[in-house]
Amino acid sequence: MISARASAYYTLLCFVLWLALSHPKYSAPSKMIKVKSQRELLELLELRSDEELLELAKAKRNTTARKDLTSVTTTVLVFTASWADQCYYTHPLWVKFANRFTTEKVKFVELNAGRFEKLCHAFRISTSNMANQLPTVLLLEDNVEYLRFPPIDITTGKAGRVVNYKERELMKYFELEGRCLATQDIGIEKKKAFR
């Protein structure tokens, strides 16, 4: 039979280990919009119905060059999951991007992949832990997918596995500085340089 004292010590030890080894929550101020429901996402993207949202996801990627970033509404969708370690470790990076690059026409949105499974399926994002596709970041220009990370291989149709998320490379890949500067209210002379 186990003594009460030994049980209390064991319980206390488990509690101390849980406190010491659990991940701290990221609690800094953030301009990233956390969407919790389909309705919020529809309002944010200015869509009328779920069908419109699924059509948006299935629409062909826009790969044509843009001429004027000042007139483009950019939405960066970050699909995350609480169980994916990579999402936990990269969350401060996405918040940093949101705080630095959010403007009136550039928005950063965080979506829980568990709540938006139909949308994940429509965007061809696997929520399986073995797929290593989370977090997936989609850049929408006027509600049409323009870029995604990790990118999908054109020949196989599968998303690549990402081991390291580097800040500089992601900023260049998504052209975040140019988008931010083009949509900020900084004066007409500087905006002409981005056309």
Predicted regions and their residues:
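Non-globular targeting/processing and membrane-anchoring segments
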Residues: 1-68, 176-195
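Non-catalytic, surface beta->alpha helical segment in thiol-disulfide oxidoreductase systems
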Residues: 3, 131-195
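Short active-site neighborhood of thiol/selenol oxidoreductases, capturing the structured segment around
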Residues: 70-85
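Short, structured motif recognition centered on aromatic/hydrophobic residues
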Residues: 75-79, 94, 108, 134-141
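Conserved beta-strand elements of beta-rich interaction domains across eukaryotes
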Residues: 81-84, 113-116, 142-145, 153-154
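Typically the conserved alpha-helix immediately C-terminal to a functionally engaged Cys/Sec
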Residues: 86-103, 112
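Short coil/turn segments at secondary-structure boundaries
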Residues: 89-92, 121-125, 150-153
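Thiol-based oxidoreductase modules, predominantly thioredoxin-like and allied folds used
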Residues: 103-121
